[in-house]
Amino acid sequence: MNKKKRILITGSSGFIGFSLALNLLKKGHKIFGYDSINNYYDVNLKLSRNKILNKFKNFSFIKGELEDQKKLNKSVLKFKPQIIIHLAAQAGVRYSLDVPRKYLSTNIIGTFNIIEIAHKIKVKHLLIASSSSVYGANKQSAFKETDKTDSQLSIYAATKKSTESIAHS
């Protein structure tokens, strides 16, 4: 990316999202972060990451749920990203057994909302992060993209596999 781009990063307060946003901001790209800042991981850590990102003039942020299609669409239409990097997800294999609806809502409906708005605004690039959990019951310890992904072992893994299928379609 040699030209400066407008990039939406969902999950921008998470470990990977923050690191990516920081790197791209330092290169001069305009970054729009979108994150629910839920309490699955330490909220104070997420807020401190946002404080660092907010020091950049080329960073803007909205706290929101991906399931809130109206808020998401309004925010994205205002920013007009050329690239969307979708890293946000409700994470955690064990927690998905306790609150499966949250995983279905955030990971499937939220990702569908991202795909839909990306299509609507005709972004040049859409990157959607998945998880090694989609490989489920495979026996080998190092996975390949060509390995089977038809035996998920958790709701979390099933939602991530579902988002892959939705994106592919």
List each model region and its residues.
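N-terminal Rossmann-like NAD(P)+-binding domain of SDR-like oxidoreductases, especially those catalyzing
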Residues: 1-169
